[in-house]
Each structure stands twice: as structure tokens, then as C-alpha cells.
Amino acid sequence: MANLGADFGVVGNVPANSSARGRAFGLEFLAQQKLYKGLYGILAYTLVRSEFSDKNGNPVPSSWDARHILSLTAGYKFKRNWELGVRFRFVDGQPYTPYDTVTSSIKSVWDITQMGISDLNRLNSERIPAYHQLDLRVDKVWYFNKWSLNLYLDIQNIYNFKSTTRPFLTVQEDQNGNPITNPNDSNRYLLQSLPNTAGTVLPTIGIIVDF
């Protein structure tokens, strides 16, 4: 069940069976630059493999098999209590199972599930594109006798990267919102695949007061 990731559901599921086997292995690398002449940073890289056995006992990538994960956090302290920080993240494309469009289009199936049925004969055979994001933050601190004031500007996803996940599978609808029947088979609906993207620039202004 854990391998289903965000696709976990209850409609049509069979009793849980612990007969499958899985394994995960990899390599981690970390380098740190402690504060030196105003500069600091941490670089972390992970090479990972995560897989489990399918219904035929063959190893396939798990939903968490991202392969390459990179994280870089760095900053510089300027004079007069100004500070600039950046963070970059990269996660390689993760596997997902494509839809069984033949089964999903059957009216009696769709009317019950209201969603696409995964094709377990092609378990985790596709991958979403890699995800990456760059964040930027600027801080200015004023120190007083018994307290300090920190004003900051934080901009996440500064270059507005649009991440892509498993596409949506849905039925085509007419202008009244009713499902359209396949003209070549009255027992099926017409389906359509819609892109599933997310991501936007997120600026934040904040104030921190320390006593």
C-alpha cells in the first residue's frame, strides 16, 4: 500500500498481502562550508534506488525511486547586518503507473470509481519529469539594547518552475456537463488525459522581533 503513494484508495482494493519484497539502497554525500569571510553553505547529494517485486515477482521501481536528489543551501553575510541566502533543490523524476484506459472507459467501472484505473501490468513503468526549484531570501537586522528587529524578503520558486505529476484521466463532457458516450461503443465513455502541473512564484515579506 505504501508504494501507491498519493494514489491510495479503497474502491475495488483487495485484502492486503505481505508477499511482496522490497529493498532500498544508495549513497549520500554532504559537504559543508562553515562561516568563512561571510560565506557559508551546505551541499547534499543522494543517489538512491528503491524497488519492490510486482505480482510476478519481478523487481520494479517503487514510487519513491527518485534516483538523484540534490540540495544546495548557501548564504553571504554583508556589512551592516545584511544577509543573502539561496536554496536550490533538485529531485529526479519519480515512477508512476499509467492508466488502463480500456478498463477505465467502461461505464459501469467509471460510474463506481469516478477515476482512472491503474494498469498494473505496467506498474511504475513511466516517470514524471524532474523537479527543481530556486529560493532566494534577503534579511536585514537592526540590533537595539534589549531587542532586535529582522525584516526579510523571501521569494520561493524564483524562476517560476512548473512541476508535472501524473496526468488526470477524466471523461469528456458535453456542454451540459454530462459524460459523452463513445460513438463506437455504447458501453464506454470517451476519456481525455489532462496535464497536471503546479508551481508559482511565492514572495513573502516578514518581520521577526526578538527580545
What are these regions (language model features)?
Residues 9-16, 53-57, 116-123, 186-192:
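Extracytoplasmic loops and strand-loop junctions of Gram-negative outer membrane beta-barrel proteins
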Residues 11, 19-24, 62-66, 124-133, ...:
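Short sequence motifs at beta-strands and strand-loop junctions characteristic
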Residues 41, 90-113, 129-133, 140-211:
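C-terminal beta-signal and adjacent terminal beta-strands/loops
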